[in-house]
C-alpha cells in the first residue's frame, strides 16, 4: 500500500502551523495516511513541535513542485492531498499530465479557487488554472465553496470539509463576560492581508454607523507590512476619531486574540470569497454576529446551521446587531458542523477518500 502524502505548497506560516499541529495532535495516531508531509518553506521548529509527523521542507514553491512531480511520475499509484495549495507549478503539472487526476486531491482554502486579482499575470493564468481544477481527482471544501466549484466542474467529486480551527468546545456555552449594550465595537478584517480590503471596509462601516462606534483592525499578520498598515491607519483616521479607531500592528498570541474578539460586538468582512473561517468560528462561538459580502459563499454554511447572517448591503444599526446577537445566543453551538469537534469525522472520511480506501 502506498502512503498518502500531504502537500503544503506555499509558505504560509500561520495556516501551515495550524494544519501541522492539527495532524500531529489529532489525526496522526489514527493511521499512516495522516503522517507524511511535504512543506514549502523553512522548518521553523515544526519538526520538533510535531514529532508524530514525517516532514520534508523545500526552499521554494518551485522546488517543492518539482519534488512532488518527480514522486508522481515515479509511482502513478502515489496519491497526494493538497492543502490550500497556492502553487502555480502544481496546477501546470496537473494540466500537462505530470500529475494525474487520480493522484490529485485538493482541500480548497478559498483564495486558490476564486479569481479576484486584477494583476496581468493572474488574469492570464486563471483560465489555465480553471481547466486544471476540472481535472482533480476530488475536492474537499465548505458548503459554499463546493457549490461554487460544482457550477464550473459538475463532474468532479466534492466532499464537505472544514479548516481545523483551533477551538475550545467548553467555551460554547460560556457565561457572557459583559453586558452587550452601549457603543458598538466592530472588528474589521481577520488579518493584515490586503485581501481584507481594509480601507473599503472602513468606509463601509463609516457609511453605516458614522463615527459612533469603536473600530478594531487586527493587522499584526503577515509580517513586514508596515507601509500598508500606515496606509490603512491614515484612511481610518480620515473617517474616525482617534479614540474610536484601534489599528493593531503587532502579532498577537492566540489567547490575546481570543480575548480581543470577545470584546467585539460585530465582525465586518467585505471580501467576496470564503476566507477567515477561523475568526468567523471564534466570533460565532462568542455570540458575535458577522457581516459578510453576498459573494462570500460561506453564508450558505452559516444558513445551513441556522445562524443569523448579516450582509454588507443590509441597513445596519445597533438594533439589528443586538437582535443578531440574541439569535446567536439561542443557538446550540455543540451542533454546528464547522465547530470542533464536529469537523473531525469529515477529516477521517477525507483521508480515506484521498488515500483510495473509500468509494
Curated annotation (Swiss-Prot):
InterPro entries: WecF (IPR009993)
EC number in record: 2.4.1.325
Chief subcellular location: membrane
GO MF annotations, alphabetized: 4-acetamido-4,6-dideoxy-D-galactose transferase activity; fucosyltransferase activity
Pathway: Bacterial outer membrane biogenesis; enterobacterial common antigen biosynthesis
GO BP: enterobacterial common antigen biosynthetic process; fucosylation
A GO CC term attached to the entry: plasma membrane
Catalytic activity line of the entry: beta-D-ManNAcA-(1->4)-alpha-D-GlcNAc-di-trans,octa-cis-undecaprenyl diphosphate + dTDP-4-acetamido-4,6-dideoxy-alpha-D-galactose = alpha-D-FucNAc4-(1->4)-beta-D-ManNAcA-(1->4)-D-GlcNAc-undecaprenyl diphosphate + dTDP + H(+)
Topology versus the membrane: Peripheral membrane protein
Location relative to the cell: Cell inner membrane
Key words, A-Z: Cell inner membrane, Cell membrane, Glycosyltransferase, Membrane, Transferase
Similarity comment text for this entry: Belongs to the glycosyltransferase 56 family.
Entry function: Catalyzes the synthesis of Und-PP-GlcNAc-ManNAcA-Fuc4NAc (Lipid III), the third lipid-linked intermediate involved in ECA synthesis.
Protein name as annotated: TDP-N-acetylfucosamine:lipid II N-acetylfucosaminyltransferase
Amino acid at each position: 500500500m502506498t502512503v498518502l502524502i500531504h502537500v503544503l505548497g506555499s509558505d504560509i506560516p500561520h495556516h501551515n502551523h495550524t494544519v501541522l499541529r492539527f495532524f500531529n495532535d489529532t489525526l496522526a495516531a489514527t493511521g499512516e495516511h495522516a503522517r507524511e508531509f511535504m512543506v514549502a518553506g523553512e522548518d521553523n521548529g515544526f519538526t520538533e513541535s510535531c514529532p508524530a509527523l514525517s516532514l520534508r521542507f523545500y526552499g521554494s514553491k518551485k522546488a517543492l513542485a518539482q519534488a512532488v512531480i518527480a514522486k508522481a511520475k515515479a509511482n502513478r499509484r502515489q496519491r497526494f492531498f493538497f492543502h490550500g495549495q497556492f502553487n502555480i507549478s502544481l496546477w501546470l503539472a496537473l494540466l500537462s499530465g505530470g500529475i494525474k487526476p487520480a493522484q490529485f486531491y485538493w482541500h480548497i482554502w478559498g483564495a486558490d479557487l476564486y479569481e479576484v486579482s486584477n494583476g496581468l499575470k493572474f488574469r492570464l493564468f486563471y483560465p489555465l488554472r480553471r481547466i486544471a481544477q476540472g481535472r482533480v481527482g476530488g475536492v474537499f471544501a465548505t458548503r459554499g465553496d463546493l457549490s461554487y466549484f460544482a457550477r464550473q466542474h459538475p463532474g468532479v467529486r466534492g466532499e464537505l470539509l472544514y479548516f481545523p480551527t483551533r477551538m475550545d468546545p467548553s467555551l460554547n456555552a460560556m457565561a457572557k463576560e459583559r453586558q452587550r449594550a452601549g457603543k458598538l465595537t466592530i472588528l474589521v478584517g481577520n488579518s493584515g492581508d490586503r485581501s481584507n480590503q481594509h480601507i473599503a471596509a472602513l468606509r463601509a462601516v463609516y457609511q453605516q454607523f458614522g463615527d459612533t462606534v469603536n473600530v478594531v483592525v487586527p493587522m499584526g499578520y503577515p509580517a513586514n507590512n508596515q507601509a500598508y498598515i500606515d496606509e490603512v491607519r491614515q484612511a481610518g483616521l480620515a473617517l474616525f476619531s482617534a479614540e474610536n479607531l484601534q489599528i493593531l500592528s503587532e502579532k498577537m498570541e492566540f489567547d490575546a486574540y481570543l480575548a480581543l474578539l470577545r470584546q467585539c460586538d460585530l465582525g465586518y468582512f467585505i471580501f467576496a470569497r470564503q476566507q477567515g473561517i477561523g475568526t468567523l468560528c471564534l466570533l460565532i462561538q462568542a455570540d458575535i454576529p458577522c457581516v459578510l459580502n453576498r459573494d462570500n459563499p460561506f453564508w450558505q454554511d452559516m444558513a445551513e446551521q441556522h445562524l443569523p447572517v448579516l450582509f454588507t448591503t443590509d441597513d445596519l444599526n445597533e438594533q439589528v446587531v443586538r437582535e443578531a446577537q440574541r439569535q446567536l445566543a439561542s443557538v446550540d453551538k455543540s451542533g454546528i458542523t464547522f465547530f470542533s469537534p464536529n469537523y473531525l469525522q469529515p477529516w477521517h472520511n477525507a483521508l480515506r477518500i484521498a488515500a483510495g480506501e473509500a468509494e
